[in-house]
């Protein structure tokens, strides 16, 4: 995938399509737990958006635009997935007990949060990290 693709129309379309797919992935992430969606589906869509950028340009360009080490992202995701149920256990609740709380924001209404969102964020990070590590490994071997 190191060849330079000079198809400008495909590259512009890929940027727009990748943005829309990533936006839909973030929307599904925040809709999760109460409605269909969540970390896994959101992670798949974010990985799809990054893969479209890698196909339209190349992997090196994608790595310049998104300079994340996806292997570390897997570890961050697993840390969130393990820390979320352990946090409720350390507070004397049953393992994996969900908690709701509000984060007060100055001049705005408080933001309602719950602990499943942190677990879903861990799943999202693990899915994006795993898929993008596989895509980059396959793409660099060619």
UniProtKB/Swiss-Prot annotation:
It is a multi-pass membrane protein. Keywords: Antiport, Cell membrane, Hydrogen ion transport, Ion transport, Membrane, Sodium, Sodium transport, Transmembrane, Transmembrane helix, Transport. GO terms for cellular component: plasma membrane. It is found in: Cell membrane. One of its GO terms (biological process) is sodium ion transport. InterPro entries: CPA3_antiporter_subunitB, CPA3_sub_B, MnhB. Belongs to the CPA3 antiporters (TC 2.A.63) subunit B family. May form a heterooligomeric complex that consists of seven subunits: mnhA1, mnhB1, mnhC1, mnhD1, mnhE1, mnhF1 and mnhG1. This is Na(+)/H(+) antiporter subunit B1. It comes from Staphylococcus haemolyticus (strain JCSC1435).
